[in-house]
């Protein structure tokens, strides 16, 4: 293998320590997915620099390898027919290609149909996964000449006439090609009614989402030429296209208004049919009221109410009960317009209003005779904020009930209520937020409590934990925290200076302190990605094997730090593999590729959850209230 010729498609992002993906010359025609991904039109012939003492190589799949040392030779243009011939000559006659669909799409996208002809003549088959989706999609079919080439070579590409028709109508505005396909002798077996239904699908045959809008011009031509069954056509477009519905109705198509009302039409469609002179009967109104999950339900009911189509007689207990759960604002609008209060279950309405924290509706329930005291326990179980509002509306808390539930989530409003009534202390509330939340959510609440502690000259509990955790998870919170006027000890001052990127006197603070071997400090330095501070700590603790082991584990967070410690210290990089991989950020592919090249198993590198609570790193993170399964 070491004497073989390889091709490099693209240089890696990190050129300080490049890790190259190279492809064996005999299989390069199967690698055009990567060529398309990197949007390149050149490839470079390389040799493996296996004489270099640091040389490493790893087989990824097939004849694709990852290596850290190469010698670049000649760069070739993929748009040169001579290059294509060279790649064909390099091919292994016994190898059966698996993914040449990317190869053909690449050259068609470049309008190099001559090269496609050359490949076809060279017996390079069109094969791969999702070949039709690769060819016939909203991205490739913006190119008129590409689509025309596919049509002319449809048998080679494995595209039946239906596939081409669907693609032409669904993705393009190439009307001449649509006409050509319609008039073709092969279209006689197409079920146009089913064809139209398929055109309105939001996903293709392979389940991929279609984002482009359907152009209706060509469909109107098919309508005019009577390609569809009128009844099937009407109900297909009724569900999916106001434009086409309007078009066929104005052409005089027959429709049954009862069926229209029973369909899931939106407000625009409803208005259109009413404006045509169709009369809404009581049965129609009841159907519309009963379909609470239909398109534009609230808008349709509001429209009908505003235009006097709806009266009290149309409502039942069931309809009103559904609206209570579905939309309190709609219910409020109905109550203000109609006398339907007798149909409302006030107990359910009051509880729903408490859960939705809808004060306006709570007030109405009280006006209608609800005793707010009967709902105080229900409110306490849900939220201290809504409980406080009920108290303001005259509610009384029973002696055996405490308004404060320490297990409820905290908001700034609830924090202030708790403090005003001395239900808990600032210190406890802060610890509760820090310890119970996996990430640094509740940023505003944390800053609110810390601001109150500072203004009252109270110490901030677990400040170290707050600083480290915020540094680990989020730029936003620690940028706000370090703006506060904090009363810091020397240890905390080091943390804050690092977070502020004020490095001038940190080295002295560390060197002359008792914290030089602190694992927490090492953790913060790694999070800062400051290599000078990292070097300082390693130099001071160079004889501490355990400290160096922690440094390597933490360095999973930052590749340049990892590379430094590996190159300069004799650390065992395999001893704590799982912990190292826990530290790697989700999108740090450089570190992942490096460790893979160094012999780490892929299953370890991409393990997103750690089930071993006994690991030292997991225990360390738990002490800081950091969830090791949530990666930044």
Curated annotation (Swiss-Prot):
It comes from the Viruses. Keywords: ANK repeat, Repeat. ANK repeats lie at residues 61-97, 228-250, 251-282, 345-374, 517-546. The keyword Repeat applies. The keyword Disulfide bond does not apply. This is Putative ankyrin repeat protein L767.
